[in-house]
Amino acid sequence: MNSIEFSLLDRTTPNSFISTTSNDLSNWSRLSSLWPLLYGTSCCFIEFASLIGSRFDFDRYGLVPRSSPRQADLILTAGTVTMKMAPSLVRLYEQMPEPKYVIAMGACTITGGMFSTDSYSTVRGVDKLIPVDVYLPGCPPKPEAVIDAITKLRKKISREIYEDRIRLQRENRSFTFTTNHKFRVVCSTNTGNYDQGLLYQPPSTSEIPPETFFKYKSSVSSPEFIN
């Protein structure tokens, strides 16, 4: 194999130094070593599991899955979240050290999905429980979309300031963690009784006046045969 030469990297200077800030150095180290806590409850998590294989290889982004929230700085929620699971999810998020991030993966996590229409126990969006940094829609999203969400989170980490993030999280804490939902009583959609005004009803022949019927009938010319 041919060797690749990098002239800029091979060039050495006796008095070389790197100029940066502590905040940029902290952001660079955190975006290259995200340790996710996998919170999968539905089929969307299977798409994330495919990232472990050699085809996508999520290890190149520095992702190291952890089973303990105290060792993770990223929680990835995938699947439906119910009212009974909400306190445990909030507890896991609170046990994660700062700074911490959240990726909401799939329609069921973001809006409740198809279960949000007639289910009394489904949380209508995980952002009502914990603050979400990246929304990843799809049912389910592809592995390429998961990689794109991780890339966007890395860009967000590289531009943020740690003190401002902590301040915003403390301000949003009062209204973020809630399980109260406003339900509206509506008729069931599975009764089979539909609004007759919305259905198309063709006019019957008895409603057409006889003179109108014979008028259009006489206007049609009979076919002519030519020998």
UniProtKB/Swiss-Prot annotation:
<keyword id="KW-0004">4Fe-4S</keyword>
<feature type="binding site">
    <location>
        <position position="139"/>
    </location>
    <ligand>
        <name>[4Fe-4S] cluster</name>
    </ligand>
</feature>
<keyword id="KW-0408">Iron</keyword>
<keyword id="KW-0618">Plastoquinone</keyword>
<dbReference type="Pfam" id="PF01058">
    <property type="entry name" value="Oxidored_q6"/>
</dbReference>
<keyword id="KW-0813">Transport</keyword>
<keyword id="KW-0793">Thylakoid</keyword>
<dbReference type="GO" id="GO:0019684">
    <property type="term" value="P:photosynthesis, light reaction"/>
</dbReference>
<dbReference type="GO" id="GO:0048038">
    <property type="term" value="F:quinone binding"/>
</dbReference>
<keyword id="KW-0520">NAD</keyword>
<feature type="binding site">
    <location>
        <position position="44"/>
    </location>
    <ligand>
        <name>[4Fe-4S] cluster</name>
    </ligand>
</feature>
<dbReference type="InterPro" id="IPR006137">
    <property type="entry name" value="NADH_UbQ_OxRdtase-like_20kDa"/>
</dbReference>
<feature type="binding site">
    <location>
        <position position="108"/>
    </location>
    <ligand>
        <name>[4Fe-4S] cluster</name>
    </ligand>
</feature>
<dbReference type="GO" id="GO:0008137">
    <property type="term" value="F:NADH dehydrogenase (ubiquinone) activity"/>
</dbReference>
<keyword id="KW-0479">Metal-binding</keyword>
<comment type="subunit">
    <text>NDH is composed of at least 16 different subunits, 5 of which are encoded in the nucleus.</text>
</comment>
<keyword id="KW-1278">Translocase</keyword>
<comment type="similarity">
    <text>Belongs to the complex I 20 kDa subunit family.</text>
</comment>
<keyword id="KW-0934">Plastid</keyword>
<keyword id="KW-0150">Chloroplast</keyword>
<keyword id="KW-0874">Quinone</keyword>
<dbReference type="InterPro" id="IPR006138">
    <property type="entry name" value="NADH_UQ_OxRdtase_20Kd_su"/>
</dbReference>
<comment type="function">
    <text>NDH shuttles electrons from NAD(P)H:plastoquinone, via FMN and iron-sulfur (Fe-S) centers, to quinones in the photosynthetic chain and possibly in a chloroplast respiratory chain. The immediate electron acceptor for the enzyme in this species is believed to be plastoquinone. Couples the redox reaction to proton translocation, and thus conserves the redox energy in a proton gradient.</text>
</comment>
<protein>
    <recommendedName>
        <fullName>NAD(P)H-quinone oxidoreductase subunit K, chloroplastic</fullName>
        <ecNumber>7.1.1.-</ecNumber>
    </recommendedName>
</protein>
<keyword id="KW-0472">Membrane</keyword>
<dbReference type="GO" id="GO:0005506">
    <property type="term" value="F:iron ion binding"/>
</dbReference>
<keyword id="KW-0411">Iron-sulfur</keyword>
<dbReference type="GO" id="GO:0009535">
    <property type="term" value="C:chloroplast thylakoid membrane"/>
</dbReference>
<feature type="binding site">
    <location>
        <position position="43"/>
    </location>
    <ligand>
        <name>[4Fe-4S] cluster</name>
    </ligand>
</feature>
<keyword id="KW-0521">NADP</keyword>
<dbReference type="GO" id="GO:0051539">
    <property type="term" value="F:4 iron, 4 sulfur cluster binding"/>
</dbReference>
